[in-house]
Amino acid sequence: MAQAQFRDYVRLVRGFNTFTRMVHCDCINGYAVGRKVSLGKVTGDLAITIFVNKKLGLRRLPLPNRIPKTIRLPSEKAKDGVLEFITDVREARFSSLEYIARERPAPSGISIGHVNITAGTLGGLVRDRESGDTVILSNNHVLADSNEAAIGDPILQPGPYDGGTDPADHIANLTRFVPIDFAADAENRVDAAIATPLNPNNVIWNTKDIGPETPATVRHLGESDLGRFVHKTGRTTEHTQGFVDAVFATVQVKYDLFQKATFVDQIIISQSPAEEAFSDGGDSGSLVYDSDNSSVGLLFAGSEGTEDEPATTIVNPMNYVLEKLNIELLSSGDHPSS
């Protein structure tokens, strides 16, 4: 029965033209068969996942553009002559270059990197409490080349791997970083750095696919937050969703063939089997938010999935990032505008 139901869903999704005419909406970017997500949690129900530019309330949508909660189609094999399909609408825009291109002003969630690395993600904008400047936040290994950089080094957007060159794409200078201690008995809490834009008008307080960055709120995670919905936008996997799998984690992170570092009090993010991996290489530096868009932490590492285990993502708790770098979140009244 379950396999037959799944095949019915696949047949409907493959009928792309028929389905497009059915919903009469040119803002749809794609379809898939997945599990229904309700309140940020994956349910056991199969659903037609419909990717749209932006989810809007019914009152803001013309009648022909409204996607029904269920789709009913006549079928001779159904007992009552009708097959019913659940729908699940999600926001997603698919583009091969959007997150690795040069952008001015540069939003968060796109390619950036120290002149000597490959590329990571521009996490967000914060305030440097020492200078009062609005600065770019990302990882040490993205902006400071894993301790190898010098203060004042050029930061490129996009990162070198994505075609960024100096001086054409020089967007900021390295300001400060928290050194990563690779000693066997050391305990690290953050992989973090900041850079000051050459021109404040070249950055914007906005995260791709999420919108204006969160007001000055930080989500401190505890036991009650296990399973909490989170999301991020990164250079490689773009906008993804996941959930808090574990907290207060101690992990060993490999930086190259010879260097490993231990991190404590970390957050582990996973995702349901129906979802793509929460992160991949190049997403380092992404800011992770909860459903209220409160800051959860700074993404910096992860593991690949296997047949039996999902991929996982490691996140520095945001309170440690703010403390160690001596920075603070921007408030809604003082962000750079586009």
Name each model feature, range by range.
Residues R14-H24, K69-L83, E130-S131, F182-A186, ...:
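Intrinsically disordered, low-complexity coil segments
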Residues M1-V126:
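Noncatalytic regulatory segments and standalone regulatory/sensor domains
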Residues G57, L143, M318-V321:
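A generic structural signal for short hydrophobic patches within well-formed alpha-helices
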Residues L97-S272, E276, G281, Y289-D292, ...:
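Serine endopeptidase catalytic core focused on the charge-relay Asp
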Residues I269-S270, A277-S279, Y289-S338:
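C-terminal subregion of chymotrypsin/trypsin-like serine protease catalytic domains
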Residues G34-V37, T236, G302-E304:
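Flexible, active-site-proximal loop/turn residues at the rims of small-molecule/cofactor binding pockets
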Residues L58-S75, N206-T217, A311-P317:
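Surface-exposed flexible segments
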